[in-house]
Amino acid sequence: MNELFLKIINMSISASWLILAVLILRLVLKKAPKWVNVLLWGIVAVRLICPLSFESALSLIPSSETIPLDIEMAAKPTIDSGVPAINSVVNPVLSSFAPPQHVLTSANPLQIWIPILNIIWLIGVGALLLYTAVSYWRLCRKVDTAVRYKGNIFQSENVSSPFVLGIIKPRIYLPFNMNGQDLEHVVAHEQAHIRRKDHWWKPLGFLLLTIHWFNPLMWLAYVLLCRDIELACDEKVIKELGNEQRADYMQALVACSVNRRMIAACPLAFGEVGVKERVKSVMNYKKPAFWVIIIAVIICVGVAACFLTNPKQDRYTLRIVVPAGSQEEFVYTEEEVSTVRNSIKIWSGDGLGDTEVLLFPVNKTAETGYTATYLTHGMSVEFDAENDTWFKIGVNMQNPTNEDIIVYVEVENV
């Protein structure tokens, strides 16, 4: 469970770089259709959902794994954010958590703190899920006496503002006191939401927010997603109704802007938000030029290429677990590597001092192994290696403590 928690933190950090890019692009693409903003938030969702990503030279994500999944077991815990300024601030703090070298049996405090943070995260997730369930139940009770107006449109005396409720079979709920002209425009707006599948995207956004609730940028992204969805829907309705009905549509928006607290509080209901901004957007709406749409789409494709991929690595960090109570012997990496340049270059990584290092071909006997070479911290050792052969890296270590020790080697040309 701790590894899952750290994986989610890493995914959230990677998505944060994308969120920052989207915040900037929302300002740059003011003249673009609002659905472009929604598409950009969709790219953020993909980054948050997919645990795996391809490597690309185009990637603008500084680091694919900021926090090592085994950081709590590391002799010297460090992060790799891909930004030296951040590393220089955070890593000295993390190093202070490491037990002194002369206290061999002391546990890494991160082994205590990470499970505690994991529990806090789970409590937060549970609280938001409970909040969603309770608010949805309260809203369902509020409309259980609603009367069918026509089709999937219902009216209720307990409703003061229109909204869409439901994911599989969405229903439109309206107050009884709406006049005919406002009702026509409001129904057009809510039906546009359903056609655009917005009643799917808002719950999905809130689900991702529930998982990544610890990230402040996720809260900002969710608020802006809801606003951008409304603005995109308004543009769609104005395009269908025509400019001559723009003033009447704005009047309907204003009429729906009161007493909507109950709707806004339910993540599974789709009510009207940001009415002032929406009225201003409707007043200033102009059909975007074709070239603006083309540029916006190209930018979205570029954003996906740069932020849905991980940075291409030319050096990898491999983990070696030194068992508790072990005598001096060679211990090997869990991962296997294969050369791409007829040689493998090795550096001493975190927790590993000067020692012997060995390149060992997998599925071969010990007699076919390479000769051990002394590895000095800060300097590299290079082994000639056959192509199409997989190797493990071994280091000569001992561990007299009662806890497993994790050390790292860095390899290149693999």
Roles of regions detected by a PLM:
Residues 1-130, 134, 167, 275, ...:
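Hydrophobic membrane-embedded segments
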Residues 43-48, 145-162, 231-239:
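Membrane-cytosol interface motif
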Residues 48-50, 287-311:
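Internal/C-terminal transmembrane anchor helices
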Residues 158-181:
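Active-site scaffold of zinc-dependent metalloenzymes
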Residues 184-198, 205, 230-234:
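Active-site recognition of the HExxH zinc-binding catalytic motif
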Residues 195-196, 220-277:
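Short helix/loop segments within enzyme catalytic domains
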Residues 346-349, 383-387, 395-401:
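Asparagine-centered strand-capping/turn motif at beta-strand->loop junctions
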Residues 353-357, 401-413:
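Edge beta-strands of jelly-roll/beta-sandwich modules across compartments, strongly enriched
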